[in-house]
Amino acid sequence: MKRGPSHERHMRRRDFLTWMGMGLAGATGASSRCQTRNGDETAGLPGRDTASSFTPDVEIALTAAPSAVQILPGALTQVWAYSGSVVKGPPSTIQSLAGSYLGPIIRLQTGQKVRVHFANQLPEHTTVHWHGLHVPERMDGHPRFIIPNGQSYVYEFEVINRAGTYWYHPHHHDRTGPQVYNGLAGLLLVSDPKEAALGLPSGAQEIVCVLQDRTFDADNQLVYGSGMPMESMNGFLGDRVLVNGQTQPSLSLATRAYRLRLLNGSNSRVYKLAWGDGTPVTVIGTDGGLLEQLLRRPYLTLAPGERADVILDLSQHRVGTSLQLRSLAFPSAPFEMGMGMGRGMRRGIGRMGGTGRQTSAANGAPFSILTIRVQRRETSNVELPATLSTFDASWHREQTEQSVRRLTVQFGRMQWLLNGRTFEMDDVAANETVSLDAKEVWEFDNSGAAMMGMRLAHPLHLHGRQFRVLDRQVDPRFAKDGDSLREGFTDEGWKDTVLVMPGERVQILVHFTRYTGMFLYHCHNLEHEDMGMMRNYRVVARAG
């Protein structure tokens, strides 16, 4: 099959093993194709036909196809892009981002039943994952339900999530990184009556910001990777940051309050977001919606896949002034391979490609993200309530039914592993099976890899569930790895992705409600995910 529009010099795991001189015999743990156990890539397409019992409130047509957009002056950039239209429901359900390769914003309401007619017009297979939404097994975009190029799939689900900032992207195993990089991503915003009653900034006062880093060649085409073997182990990094698919973005705003919906849509880059004038960052929401009370942070740490809702109050700014949203510098050590294998390859300003030009900036390099220009005077009466939302009081450790389920981050066979295992399409281990309606404490343990010298942070994502972060414990020997980012964590909110630093053990509380079936948990560093740092977990009905 033809690959993507970017110049892909990125090493896949099999290539990396060969480079390391280990041969293909060590590659038995990962599959390079998305097949079901019987080897039929088109098997498991139940979404081709609509369910007769499902009556949608909203119906959408969504297509993934090659396209070309103006990102830089000169030649158009070849991308892959989602496009959409409303078949049934409010016209406002689909909102395109003009001049962007990003998919349309999909606006839904809690309680709506949604049908999405998805058409794959790409030159390769794909799926659509509704990141953060609680949906049935066959509707979650698992690579078992791969959609071959030229074919279609019907996704049907009820929106049972609370209001919040979610998103959608592909989930083709070992191709998620390049497919997202080539442009396949979009925001999905859910509203509900409780949030609407708060009177938060909306309409023109609601601003979406999807942060992604990219590298372009001299002809304005995307470059995915440098071909360096450590890149697969560390994750892809570009040499510039785009907001909503645009370079050097700026906004002309007024002296009033705005709501910024932020998504880190990068493959592996972590952002340390702060206002240029030192004003604290006011956070009102995380992955799964509004916090109970707002948080004020000196900066906001946003790992790949994470979202945050931020209030920007410009009421005290003078007309004619400007404000920068920046990503501050932080040490790159927790995001680079150790053991002498490439450590320092990306230290400092970045890494040089085969042509001698800089192809990336290190994780932790400072960036100017967005320039805000205050150009007019307006008054607004937005007052944030003391209580933004109320969380279920039963979400406490004491409500869990069993001991902690420990899930370890490990490095072996020249790849990142979860519990010593790599991804297998249909495989679920005994300790990856949970009971429907169970409340469990899961512990993501990243201490062992750190002890081995593999001191990398991992943003770990759980499909189909929102969770609460209960606790972080860090080995004092590795505490400095996270010190420069720790004040920006937003563990107080509902999460589906959490950054686990080297030497750290993070405990989360999860309630496995509503749907049985097989779902994924994985690292949301997309290169790690594609190399096999992903596993299934299965939710089963209780006996009797």
Name what the model sees in each region.
Residues 73-78, 130-132, 138-143, 147, ...:
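Active-site pocket scaffolds in enzymes
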Residues 25-30:
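Hydrophobic h-region of N-terminal signal peptides that target proteins for export
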Residues 158-162, 313-319, 512-516:
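Short, surface-exposed loop/turn segments at beta-strand-coil junctions that are enriched for proline
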Residues 171-173, 328-330, 447, 524-526:
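Beta-strand-rich extracellular modules
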Residues 164-166, 321-323, 519:
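Exposed beta-strand face motif in extracellular beta-rich ectodomains
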Residues 3-10, 19-23, 34-313, 333, ...:
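Histidine-centered copper-binding motifs that mark active-site loops
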